[in-house]
Design a protein with these regions (language model features):
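Conserved donor-binding/catalytic core segment of Leloir-type glycosyltransferases
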Residues: 128, 174-178
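Short aromatic-enriched loop/helix-cap "lid" or pocket-rim segments at secondary-structure transitions
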Residues: 1, 55, 77-82, 87, ...
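Carbohydrate-associated surface elements
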Residues: 133, 155
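Short N-terminal targeting/anchoring amphipathic segment
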Residues: 30-50, 64-70
Length: 178
């Protein structure tokens, strides 16, 4: 009963403040029993209000961390992709991409970026990306540039997905040549 109330309160607070999984209390219950026997802990999408970033140092004490990225969320103050915004390289803040519905507003992205910096300074995961582009972003990020990182592309059936010249693909899709 108390645990359930605490979890609900934590989720409400995270959603209301736009913390996006930064401090979720729910993940503190039971993580140890799963992590203690692991040879390695492979993280994927840990955002969206179900995991606390604050757990990462504790988890790494139990087993090495491998973090497979699928977007830029771990590199920014909360954006999944930064698009043309360069703020993720300098600490975020006044974010043009942050949804207005977040209570913390656009400046809250600086707080989340700083929180990530503090947590990441206490861990040393191996970062895995599915693309060379995302690997370059990991290497550029002030939050993750010191981590060992590698690219492991998703497996694709090359009999179905055939490489072709960009100009041919753009023409087939009806896109402009540039």
């Amino acid at each position: 009963p108390l645990r359930r109330l605490l979890c609900r309160l934590s989720r409400w607070m995270e959603i209301s403040l736009g913390l996006d999984g930064a401090t979720n209390v729910t993940s503190w219950f039971g993580y140890r029993r799963h992590a203690e026997w692991a040879d390695v802990i492979n993280l994927h999408n840990i955002h969206s209000y179900y995991f606390s970033l604050l757990l990462l140092p504790r988890m790494e004490r139990l087993a090495p961390l491998v973090w497979t990225l699928h977007d830029m969320w771990p590199l920014t103050g909360g954006c999944y992709y930064c698009y043309a915004c360069p703020n993720w390289l300098t600490g975020c803040g006044r974010c043009p991409e942050t949804p207005e519905h977040r209570r913390g507003g656009r400046a809250f992205s600086r707080f989340l970026h700083t929180l990530r910096h503090r947590v990441y300074s206490r861990i040393n995961p191996v970062m895995v990306t599915p693309s060379r582009w995302l690997l370059r972003q990991v290497q550029r990020s002030p939050l993750t540039h010191r981590f060992r990182a590698t690219c492991i592309p998703y497996g694709l059936d090359t009999d179905v997905f055939l490489p072709t010249r960009k100009s041919v693909a753009r023409e087939a899709l009806g896109l402009p040549p540039d």
